[in-house]
Amino acid sequence: MVHRNARQNDQHLGKYNGLGGKLEVDEDVAAGMRREIREEASIECLEMSLRGTVSWPGFGKQGEDWFGFLFLVTRYRGTPPAQNPEGDLKWVALDALQTLPLWEGDRHFLSLMFDADPRAFHGVMPYRDGRMVSWNYSRV
């Protein structure tokens, strides 16, 4: 995870986030995930699986809607550095995830990322004024 502690104007300042980012033009979501992991952690994803999607209406700084594809990387090559331009990179034990400063809503779907159910989850988590309003999901 990245502890977003490097940029004072960061919307995520002080919080822990999974690695990822925005897609480039003409880039599919799997290629975008591999590129973001390579850019942010200097590792190559050898195996990953789509665990779910989340729609975040109203989440952006100006109330923009965000949509995320959540992947679990199960095999990689390389050694991540201690930090990147966004902050410190940390390996976090699963049982410690809920103790970290996270976005309020992340606590609702993190367990779905690591559970034994092979089906992907698809959730919607509206935000208003920087706060989660609700959380609903289904599995397919």
Question: Model features per residue range: what roles?
Answer:
Residues 1-17, 45, 49, 64:
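N-terminal strand-loop-strand
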